[in-house]
Amino acid sequence: MGELPIAPVDRLIRKAGAERVSEEAAKILAEYLEEYAIEVSKKAVEFARHAGRKTVKAEDIKLAIKS
């Protein structure tokens, strides 16, 4: 874990209306977002392979999000 930088996650929380964000809150959200992104990516890879491709395309990501 730890691939996502905390600063952009902090900005997302502030964009949602928070005036202040604890470092722990930003870290927890970053961990969740990273886990979610990995799960979506795994599904997208499966869709690409099923289509006979090695390259994951935007359509694979979109399908993975919907599934």
Curated annotation (Swiss-Prot):
Its main location: cytoplasm. It holds the Pfam family CBFD_NFYB_HMF. One of its GO terms (cellular component) is chromosome. InterPro entries: Archaeal_histone_HMF (IPR050947), CBFA_NFYB_domain (IPR003958), Histone-fold (IPR009072), HmfB-like (IPR050004). Residues 20-22, 54-57 are annotated as: Interaction with DNA. It is found in: Cytoplasm; Chromosome. Keywords: Chromosome, Cytoplasm, DNA-binding. GO terms for molecular function: DNA binding; protein heterodimerization activity. Belongs to the archaeal histone HMF family. Homodimer or heterodimer with another histone. Dimers then assemble into higher oligomers, with the DNA wrapped around the protein core. Binds and compact DNA (95 to 150 base pairs) to form nucleosome-like structures that contain positive DNA supercoils. Increases the resistance of DNA to thermal denaturation (in vitro). This is Archaeal histone A. It comes from Pyrococcus sp. (strain GB-3a).
